[in-house]
From Swiss-Prot:
GO terms for cellular component: cortical actin cytoskeleton. Residues 4-139 form the ADF-H domain. It comes from Bos taurus (Bovine). Keywords: Acetylation, Growth factor. This is Glia maturation factor gamma. GO terms for biological process: actin filament debranching; negative regulation of Arp2/3 complex-mediated actin nucleation.
Amino acid sequence: MSDSLVVCEVDPELKEKLRKFRFRKETDNAAIVMKVDKDRQMVVLEEEFQNISPEELKMELPERQPRFVVYSYKYVHADGRVSYPLCFIFSSPVGCKPEQQMMYAGSKNRLVQTAELTKVFEIRTTDDLTEAWLKEKLSFFR
């Protein structure tokens, strides 16, 4: 049932940006940070970052407000192969307003489906977002 719960639509401009981001040719880390526009009941672009490490990205996320992130990460595998997985990270810090938490939680599935992402992770504190954490999460996807 939770799959059908949609609180906010995805902004059409954001949909197009996510589509282009998916097919980007650059080989550095990059991120799209999104938020819920409560008045418009819509997920919108907040900011875009190029050449940003997980540690730098962590500093850009609010500590007390939820955010959605699509992160293109240069992942060097143990055998030397390089891939560029697109990761969806739901930052849902402890201490957010329940109403805000519900809006984000209810909008997450629609956004993941819209962006066609399979690597979906959640953090409860921005401190969790580190390169070691991301590599550990990605190690489950061979």
